[in-house]
Structure formats: C-alpha cells, structure tokens
Curated annotation (Swiss-Prot):
Name of the gene this protein is made from: STU2
Quaternary structure note: Binds to microtubules. Homodimer; each monomer can bind via its TOG domains to two alpha/beta-tubulin heterodimers. Interacts with SPC72. Associates with the NDC80 complex.
Residue spans of biased composition, Low complexity class: 765-780
Region feature TOG 1, mapped onto this chain: 8-280, 326-550
Record-given protein name: Protein STU2
Positions carrying Phosphoserine: 2, 277, 813
Domain writeup: The coiled coil domain mediates homodimerization. The TOG (tumor overexpressed gene) domains are composed of six (for the most part non-canonical) HEAT repeats each. Intra-HEAT loops are positioned along a face of the TOG domain and bind to a single alpha/beta-tubulin heterodimer. Two sets of TOG domains may wrap around a single free tubulin heterodimer accompanied by a open-to-closed conformational change of the STU2 homodimer. Both, TOG 1 and TOG 2 bind curved alpha/beta-tubulin with comparable affinity; the two TOG domains bind noncooperatively to two tubulin heterodimers.
Stated consequence of mutating residue 23 to A: Disrupts interaction with tubulin heterodimer. Impairs polymerase activity under microtubule stress
Family matches, as SMART domains: TOG
InterPro entries in the record: ARM-like, ARM-type_fold, HEAT_type_2, Stu2_CTS, TOG, XMAP215, XMAP215_CLASP_TOG
Length: 888
C-alpha cells in the first residue's frame, strides 16, 4: 500500500475531511457537522465555525451533490439541521433569497431523484424549510418549473411532486395568483400528456392541489386548462374533484414571518387580557378585545386566515386578451347594411361563429367598439328580421360580458341600451330571451339603481318604457326593474329619490293593467318595494287598491326574501342609515325608535322611587345588593357601543334637536357622497389623461416607425428602378444586335441567290458557245463568279490563280461581317492542260461543253461554300441568343 492510502483520515481536521477523496471520510465529516448543528441550536450566532456554512452557500452546494449516495444522504441531513438551527433567527433579506436559489435546484435535481428513500425525504424537508424563510412559494416554484422541460422522466416527476408539496404546505399566501397560476398551468398540459405514467400521475395530483388551494375553483381550470387536456383526463379530474368535497385546502406549515407575527399577536393578547381583566369582578372569567367588547369564549390562538377559506381568484383577469375588430369578415360593412336580409344574417353569423363565440376576453385598451356596437344597436332597433335581431343581441351581451367594466364604457351602453328596451316588443322566445340576457348583463355592470347616481339615465329609460303603449314592452321592462331591485347591493338612495313621484305611480299603473300577466309582475314589483321600504311607506297607496289586489300583493310579499334595508335589528338599521339619504333616515328612525322606548317602559324598576340609572345604562336599586352584583357582572357582557350614557340621549331627544341632527347628518352624508363622486371623477379623468398620453406616445412611435419603413421602401424602389433601366438598356442593345445580324443574314441569302442565278446564266451561255470557235479575247475563264482578261499569259494567269487561292484561304477565316465580300470573290476556274502541261488559249476556245465535268465541280464547290456560310450564320445567331439570355 502507498503512503497516501495509509494515512488515517480520522486524524485530519473537519475542513479537510469534508473534501477528502475517500467517501467514508466525507461521510464521517457530514455526520459530525450534523451533530454540531444540533448541539448548537441556542448559540449559533456566536459560533463562527457554524456561521461560515450559513454565510457561504457554495460549501453545502458541494456537499449535497456528493458523488457517493451514502455520503450525499448524510450531507442533506446535515443541511436540514443547519436550516432548522438558523430558521428562527433568520430575517427576510437578500441572503435568504441567495440560499434558496442556490440550494433548491440542487436538491430537486440530485436529492429528489435519488434511489434512497431517506435522501428524497430529507431533500423535500430541506426545500420546504428553505421556502419557509421566504414570504411566499413564488420563488421556490419558479426555481422548480425549469425542470419540467427536462427529458428525464424521473426528474420531471420529482419536480411536479415538489410543486405539489410546496402548494400543499404553504398554500397561496402572498402569491400574485394572476401571474403565478397562468405561468404554472402553461406547463401542465405537456406534463399531463407525458409518456411516463409516473409523470402523468404526479401531474394529476398537482392539478387537484391547485383546485383545492384556489377554493375549489373549477371555473378557473375549465377556462385555462381543461380545453388543453384529453376528455378522459378531464373526466378523471372531475371524479377527483368530487372526492375533495367542499372544504378548501388548509395549509400545513407556516412561514417564519407568520410564526413571528403569531407569537407577537399572542403576547399582545395576553398583555391586553391581563391589563383589562381588572374591569371584571371575576378576574379572568371574560376576555375583552381592544375596543372593550367582551369575547364570549372566543379562541385567541386561531390559525391564520389563510386556513379558513380558499383564495379568491378573478378568473377573468387571468385570461389572455383578444382583439376582434381586426377579424371582421370581408366586406362586413357592405353586407351588414345590405337590403337583403340573408346577407345581413350571414355576415352576423359568420362573425359570431368564427370570432365572437371563440373569444374569452376582449382587449379594451386601444380598441374602439363604438362603430361595431352602433351597427348592432341599429339592427336591434330597426331590422325587420328577427334572426338578425337575436344575433345582434347575443353579440352585444358577449361583448359586454367579455369587456366588463371599465372596458365596456358608459358610451357603449348608450348605443345599445335604448334599442334593446325598444325591441322587447318581440314575442318569439329565442329573440326575447337574447334581449333579456343582454339587458341583464348591461345592468349587471351598470346598475340603474346605483347610489352614485351615474346611471340615473338608465333608470329613467326603464321607467319610461314601463309606461309604453305596447303591453309586451311594459311587461319586459317591469321585469327588468324588478330584477334590478332584487340584485341591488349598494343601497336604495337613487330609488328613494324617484319613489314618490315616478316609481309608485308607474307601479300602480302596472298593477291596474288590463292584462293578468302584466298585473302579476306589477304585484311582484309592489311587493319588492314593500320589502325594501316597509309597509308603512305605502299605506295610503294601498288604500286606493281593491281587496283582491292587496291580497295578491301581501301573498307575494310573503314569498320574497328579506332585503338589507328592511332588516329589523337596530344595528343593521343604524348601519343602513350611514349609507342612505335623508328620506331613508327619517323612515328608518321612525321604525327603530320603537325598540328603545319598549326597553325603558318594560323595566320593572321604572316606577321605583329608590331606583336610579347608573352611567352605563343598567337599572340598579340600593336596597338590593344582589341586583347590583348582577348588574356589575352584566357590565362586561355589553359591547362598547351599548355603553353610551342614556342621560344625554334622553336630555337631547327633543324634536328640534332631532331635526338638527338629521339635517347635519344629511348634509354630512351629501358632502361625503359629493366628495366620493368628485374623487372618482378626478381619478377617472386622470386615468383618461394618462391613457391619452400613453396612446399619443404610442402613436408617435408608430408614426416614426412607419416613416422609417417608408424611407426604406423608397430607397429599395429607387434601386429597383435603376436595375430595371439597366436591364432595359441591355435588352435594347441585344435587340439591335439581333436585328443587324438578321439583316446581314438576309443580305447574304440575297447575294447567294444572285450568285446562283449568275452561275446558271454563265452555264447556259457556255453551252451555246461550245459549238463555235471563239476568239480568246471573248472567252471568260470564270463560269459566272468572276471575269478574267483573255489576254493574260499563262504565267500571269497562274499567279493570279495562286493569289486568289491564297486570298480565299485567308478570307475563309475572317469574321462573318466579310461574308458578302467573300461570296463575291468566289472563282470557278476549270481548264485543261496540253501535253506540255500548259494551257493555251486555243485549248480554252476548243472546250467541249458537252463534257460537264468542270461546270459540275464549280457548282458543287459553290454549294459547299454556301452551306458552310449558312452553318456559321446559324452558330452566330445561337451565340447571340445565349449572350442575350445571360445578360437578362
């Protein structure tokens, strides 16, 4: 064995053993660290040897990724002990964020995927403890989500299980669900369709946990997730949801900041309990809150509010915005205004089927729907085709519901609300149902009875149509009015202002209508008013109705639920008075004044001369100490609001003071309402200004971008024009060249024809001369191509022939431009030699033209030259065409 292997690693210091090459040495070092952390829980702030592992997360980042699985397991156990030791004293700061971002991904990748059960359990415990140092699970989940894109199924399943455990342990406390859930659910369909069964199983568990922590909100999952899953998976999820029940998920763990707040709250409550227990004779029997109210057996150590109910999520705000104005069908404007009803209906159906029905949320910013809603309003009000009216009403309802407020502005309401009221005259069920839904949807977002009074114009339109001459319109508008009163949750101050002069007279007309169906709706309307304002308000009005109608109204009143303003308790009446106008205050004060008077009159000690009223309002007698003790005991059972001094109330209960108080309350309430209205208007104006400025900036940027694009397009166009001109010049040159070549060819052909004719003429003339003896001066040695002098001597004639042959050979290699000259220079010289080898003139004169050998040879030679010329001309043409094609 070598010297290095014989070293006893147990003698090495801890720092060296933590990085020693033998895994057993590292294992023992990790165990020693774990024991050190456990023994130093109460004194970790003073021990620098422990602080270094907390301050430098890279140390344990190396330990928990140990190559040996046994040593790695012990390193993760030591890390868990380290986190437990520092968790209680660790405050929320950037260092905690560094620890989480450094250790969590390593624990997921190396710990949760381990084959050892203890390693996986301890890794999950470390991840949860690290998340407890944060304020929410957002960062931890964001660190785990990238593992969903990995290829290893074991790692993907571990990541899905990690997110599930985080949500089950901490819930959605301090989580911005509007951004958190869409980012998480974006990866779920891919995981649900994974090829590995374990991944799919963990994904289903994660979906069920999301359902639980969102307060059993299945609508959220249906809108965002279910359409991306397989039908069988959706069916299985519904079965799992049914097993969960109606109880929302409760968190198992608390963040460290929650633990500190809960401990602080408990200590404060304990101090308050000790400080205020002296108010009771039986010390410690009752608990009193900070307002002095008695706590009747309430638990002070209640869990956080997050464990009491699920998170309320606005599903609509999480949906992606879509645009529809850029998806209008082709020629929509022309087709929708066509005189043919089929064209109008087809345009509406095409837009509804392809765009509107598929839309989940409409974009409101930088989109103007006035033109589209104006078209729908015109169709609803004027179109004779009820199918087009129904489609337009459905479209209006969907646009209103997908824009909501403030996207569906009051300007849009004015375009469609009155046309819808006018068209309630339709009796076909499908049409009138579409109109009803559209009206109810608009009133859902713009309540005609809102206490702010901004929608009083809508209330006036409804009341005006309740007096319409058409019975169907009266009935439908009365039903809409009843629905608005039933759904009102903001008080009835607006209805109170219109009650005496407009609402009651119109309702009386409806009650006295000639048609039974309309009267029944009128009875319901009157009954709702009685439920809201009380029977005493309408005593005189009911006297003008016959007994049968009064009976019908009373029966209807019994079937209706109670409304907030009609509540009989003094507390609810006082709370309602804070939100109502002066007329409501008078009415409610008159009703609520009965209760105190009865309590005073029913007291058995009222007529006792020895009795007296104590400052807290309870009646006591000096001769009955037991009664005094009972009253002293009952003091703590009264709330602080009931401890007002009745002497002041009785002394200031004159009619004059009541009127002044009511007047002051009315003025104060009016000023408060005006202030609220002005504040809202100011905010809306500021928002509009900001939106206008933003829109202006966007338009300026877009304008600059378009200008740059225009400049680029112009420069490209100029370049293309220059290239086009150059191409045109090249084409013109090539065309001219082709024309010149064609002319040359044509001239050559003409010259060849001439030469041929000349040869034929010479042959004929020589045939005539053959029978005669011709003088040498008149004999031509050329057969039609070129004439020679008859007086040439033999030597000169031979020299001329030699020169002409040389010239012919030289010219045969010249360019095609010399073709006419070369054709003219062609010579045919047939001659015969005598015995001495010299041709004489007499021999030429004695030519036997019956022997056609010489003429045939000359003709063949001319034909060969002609064919050669034609072949060269064709090659020249082909070459010119190729050059023209290449240039183009």
């Amino acid at each position: 064995m070598s010297g290095e292997e014989e070293v006893d690693y147990t003698t090495l210091p801890l720092e060296e053993r933590l990085t020693y090459k033998l895994w057993k040495a590292r294992l023992e070092a990790y165990k020693e660290l774990n024991q050190l952390f456990r023994n130093s829980v109460g004194d970790i702030s003073r021990d620098d040897n422990i602080q270094i592992y907390w301050r430098d997360p890279t140390l344990f980042a190396q330990y928990i990724t140990d190559s040996n699985v046994v040593a790695q397991e012990q390193a993760i156990v030591a890390l868990n002990s380290l986190i437990d030791a520092f968790a209680s004293s660790s405050l929320k700061n950037a260092h905690n964020i560094t620890l989480i971002s450094t250790w969590t991904p390593l624990l997921v990748e190396k710990g949760l995927t381990s084959s050892r059960a203890t390693t996986k359990t301890q890794s999950m415990s470390c991840i949860l403890s690290l998340c407890g140092l944060d304020t929410s699970i957002t960062q931890s989940v964001e660190l785990v989500i990238p593992f969903f894109e990995k290829k290893l199924p074991k790692l993907i399943a571990a990541a899905a299980n990690c997110v599930y455990e985080l949500m089950a342990a901490f819930g959605l406390t301090n989580v911005n669900v509007q951004t958190f859930l869409p980012e998480l659910l974006k990866h779920v369909p891919q995981l649900a369709g994974h090829g590995d069964r374990n991944v799919r199983s963990q994904t289903m568990n994660l979906i069920v946990e999301i359902y639980k922590v969102t307060g059993n909100n299945s609508d959220l999952l249906e809108e965002i997730l279910f359409k991306k899953l397989k039908p069988i998976q959706v069916k299985d999820l519904h079965k799992l949801f049914a097993k969960v029940g109606d109880e929302p998920s409760s968190s198992k763990m608390l963040f460290e900041w929650e633990k500190r707040e809960l401990e602080k709250k408990r200590s404060q409550e304990e101090e308050a309990r000790k400080r205020k227990s002296i108010l009771s004779n039986d010390e410690g029997e009752y608990q009193i809150d900070k307002d002095g109210d008695t706590l009747m057996g309430m638990e002070t150590d209640m869990p956080p509010s997050k464990q009491q109910s699920g998170v309320q999520i606005d599903t609509f705000s999480m949906l992606p915005e879509e645009t529809i104005l850029d998806k209008l069908p082709k020629d929509f404007q022309e087709r929708i205004t066509s005189s043919k009803w089929k064209d109008r209906v087809e345009a509406l159906e095409e837009f509804w089927d392809s765009v509107l029905s598929q839309t989940k949320k409409l974009k409101s910013t930088s989109q103007n729907y006035s033109n589209l809603l104006g078209i729908y309003g015109h169709i609803i009000q004027k179109d004779a085709n009820i199918q087009a009216v129904a489609l337009a009403a459905q479209s209006v309802e969907l646009i209103c519901d997908k824009l909501k407020t403030p996207g569906f502005s009051k300007d849009y309401v004015s375009l469609v609300f009155t046309p819808l009221l006018d068209r309630t005259k339709e009796k076909k069920p499908s049409v009138i149902e579409a109109i009803r839904k559209a009206l109810l949807t608009i009133c859902k977002y713009y309540d005609p009875l809102a206490s702010s009074g901004r929608n009083e114009d809508m209330l006036k339109d409804i009341l005006e149509h309740m007096k319409h001459k058409t019975p169907q319109i009266r009935m439908e508008c009365t039903q809409l009015f009843n629905a608005s009163m039933k759904e009102e949750k903001d008080g009835y101050s607006t209805l109170q202002r219109y009650l005496k002069d407009e609402v009651v007279p119109i309702v009386i007309q409806i009650v006295n209508d000639t048609q039974p169906a309309i009267r029944t709706i009128g009875f319901e309307s009157f009954a709702i008013l009685i439920k809201i304002f009380g029977m005493n308000t309408f005593v005189k009005t009911l006297e003008h109705l016959d007994n049968l109608k009064r009976k019908k109204i009373e029966e209807t009143v019994k079937t209706l639920p109670n409304f907030s303003i009609a509540s009989g308790s003094t507390h609810s009446t006082i709370e309602t008075n804070k939100q109502t106008g002066p007329m409501e205050n008078k009415f409610l004060l008159k009703k609520s004044s009965v209760l105190p008077s009865k309590r005073v009159a029913s007291s058995p000690l009222r007529n006792d001369n020895k009795s007296k009223v104590n400052p807290i309002g309870s009646v006591a007698s000096a001769s009955k100490p037991s009664m005094v003790a009972a009253n002293n005991k009952s003091r703590v059972l009264l709330t602080s609001k009931s401890l007002a001094t009745p002497k002041n109330v009785v002394a200031n209960s004159t009619d004059k003071n009541e009127k002044l108080i009511e007047e002051y309350k009315y003025r104060l309430q009016k000023l408060q309402n005006d202030e609220m209205i002005w504040t809202k208007e100011r905010q809306s104006l500021l928002e509009k200004m900001n939106n206008t400025e933003n829109y202006k900036i966007e338009m300026i940027k877009e304008n600059e971008m378009l200008r740059e694009q225009l400049k680029e397009a112009q420069s490209k166009l100029n370049e293309k024009n220059i290239q086009l001109r150059s191409k045109e010049i090249d084409v013109n040159k090539l065309s001219d060249r082709v024309l010149s070549l064609e002319n040359e060819l044509r001239n050559m052909e003409i010259e060849l024809d001439r030469n041929k004719k000349r040869n034929d003429t010479n042959l004929q003339s020589m045939g005539t001369i053959s029978s005669y003896s011709i003088p040498s001066s008149t004999v031509s040695s050329n057969y039609g191509v070129k004439s020679l002098s008859s007086a040439l001597p033999f030597k000169e004639e031979e020299d001329v022939r030699r020169k002409e042959d040389v010239n012919y050979e030289r010219r045969s290699s010249e360019s095609i431009g010399d073709l006419p000259h070369r054709v003219n220079s062609l010579n045919i010289r047939p001659y015969r030699k005598n015995g001495t080898g010299v041709s004489s003139v007499s021999d030429d004169l004695d030519i036997d033209f019956n022997d056609s050998f010489a003429s045939e040879e000359s003709y063949k030679r001319a034909a060969a030259v002609t064919s050669t010329l034609k072949a060269r001309i064709e090659k020249m043409k082909a070459k010119s065409r190729r050059e023209g094609t290449t240039r183009t």
